[in-house]
Amino acid sequence: MCGIVGYIGTQAATDILLAGLEKLEYRGYDSAGIATVWEGEINCVRAKGKLHNLRSKLELIETPAQIGIGHTRWATHGKPEEYNAHPHVDTAMPVAVQNGIIENYRELREELKAKGHVFRSETDTEVIPHLIAEILKNFSASSSSSDFLEAVSQAVNRLEGAFALAVVCADYPDELIVVRQQAPLVIGFGQGEFFCASDTPAIVAYTRAVLPLENGEIARLTPLGIEIYNFAGHRLKKQPRLLNLNPTMVVKTGFKHFMLKEIHEQPGVVRASLEAYFNNGRGKWRSPINLRLPENLYTDLEQIHIVACGTSWHAALIGKYLIEQLAGISTQVHYASEYRYAPSPLTSNTLIIGVTQSGETADTLAALAMEKERRQGKEAKYEARLLGITNRPESSLLSHLVPNIISTLAGIEIGVLATKTFTAQLMAFYALALDLAAHRQTASKETLEKIINGLREIPKDIESTLESQERLTEQLAHEFAETQDFIFLGRGINFPIALEGALKLKEISYIHAEGYPAGEMKHGPIALLDAKVPVVAIAVPGSVYEKVISNAQEAKARDSRLIGVTPVKDGEAGEIFNDLLPVSHVEELLSPLLTVVPLQLLAYHIAARRGLDVDQPRNLAKSVTVE
């Protein structure tokens, strides 16, 4: 959600901080600010709205400061106003930025007010610099080089909640202190300079050597090096790792928006997944899939529970379908935010899968942590079997919770809306379902080979769909830009695609849209239909094709304009649908990888036609790191 950037070194800090904040815009924000230290003074500049407002203010101020922190804020405590924007400063000069929530800020605020501290915002973050200042004030007159670090450490030990911090102070101009407690923060290593950020895209232009902090760690960054401690004050020895990230991933490379670029990157995502997950006939494998998961994860498996949020939840629904149909394992999909407070009864030999693009989704991590805790100390059959599916294997998911990961291979996704990461999650579920089927021998070798061969053709099929759909969806966008409501229908494995299509449209165009199982339309949603409510129906030849066509006819009888996502261009489909968004003809089991593409493009073009911010839609954050 919020984005943090910090710098200390030999270059002008302001430009580096601004560039880093631009790379974190995808996380969502409503205000921004930067604070630098120069000649014993703090220069703090904040602005409501987009970064260009902050940049305009900074252009009026020239400072050669070589240390500073920056922040993009997504409002949780207090309105999105300039006075609530970060950084927050105490008159004694500590300055802090924070991502997360301080749960006990009210009692700390009252305690500090009683000691004479004056607060100027409504945020929870403002207690942090005041608390640090109060602790520094109580230190002895003989200052120590470790005073600032010690003050931040003492302050952090009084904070309750999930947060990441970056703090500077005018009295300690050569120190940048950073903290992680259940919110992401990564340190970057340069030559005589160091960086910190909420996410690696902010610093990849300057360094490939990074070290993600772990929960309960605090680091002091100086021009001479980095010291890392735990909250108990014990120094830790840690080494950075080299980041395998191409800088072109964080630029548009000729596309108007990141979202459009990322939609067009999906064939490459499927190819990368095929290369990584499938053995290509090499080696003596029991399964044609190579996910590098331990055998005991599959042993005597009876049930699977999947926890996820948003688009990842839709991917999980397709995963459920694949696992049950191919591997014959009963699978349940839960909203992580609900599962935390109403978990299923404890069952034996159960695999718990957490799906999170960022690896930092607060509710998903909390659901996995709860599952891990409630199974601890139980007899062997109840032991926690945890698996994560994430696009960020360096995230909290692997480092703190889940010993087993299927790393999706989408690369960095900058657009707030999940497009290529959704496809990457689907590929992970195809691989998992096929691997389970091979291990359990619930599908013949010939069946597995047929599905895998079909998957190998998918990249070309997506490329063909993209080539044909760009113009068609752009034309439809012109006609539907002022539409107020949409209905999306699907059945079987394509019902989750109807949900995903509706979610994409409402997220980016702010048009009310709902997805339904096509068979449920007559049980309520049909009351909404008239000439002003278009209906998008996903009709793929297979077990439910005729049923979807029948449901579509019911909508047409109520004067709704029908848009068909289908490989069938003539016959009954050609007569029923007013508009066709054709996709290649593939096995029904593989069709979600294709049917989602025109729905992504339709949402994109409608939003662009309406003149909206495609890559940063209002009120949304790429990584939801608070509950």
From Swiss-Prot:
EC category: transferase
Record keywords, A-Z: Aminotransferase, Cytoplasm, Glutamine amidotransferase, Repeat, Transferase
PROSITE patterns to which the protein is assigned, alphabetical: GATASE_TYPE_2, SIS
Cellular compartments annotated: Cytoplasm
Primary site of residence: cytoplasm
GO biological process: carbohydrate metabolic process; fructose 6-phosphate metabolic process; protein N-linked glycosylation; UDP-N-acetylglucosamine metabolic process
Catalytic center residues: 2, 622
Boundaries of every SIS domain copy: 293-442, 476-617
Cysteine disulfide partners in this protein: none
Keyword Iron on entry: no
Positions of the Glutamine amidotransferase type-2 domain: 2-224
Catalytic activity annotation: D-fructose 6-phosphate + L-glutamine = D-glucosamine 6-phosphate + L-glutamate
The enzyme's E.C. designation: 2.6.1.16
GO MF annotation, one: carbohydrate derivative binding
Listed GO CC annotations: cytosol
Pfam families per record: GATase_6, SIS
Record's function text: Catalyzes the first step in hexosamine metabolism, converting fructose-6P into glucosamine-6P using glutamine as a nitrogen source.
Subunit structure: Homodimer.
Protein name according to UniProt: Glutamine--fructose-6-phosphate aminotransferase [isomerizing]
Gene name, Swiss-Prot/TrEMBL: glmS
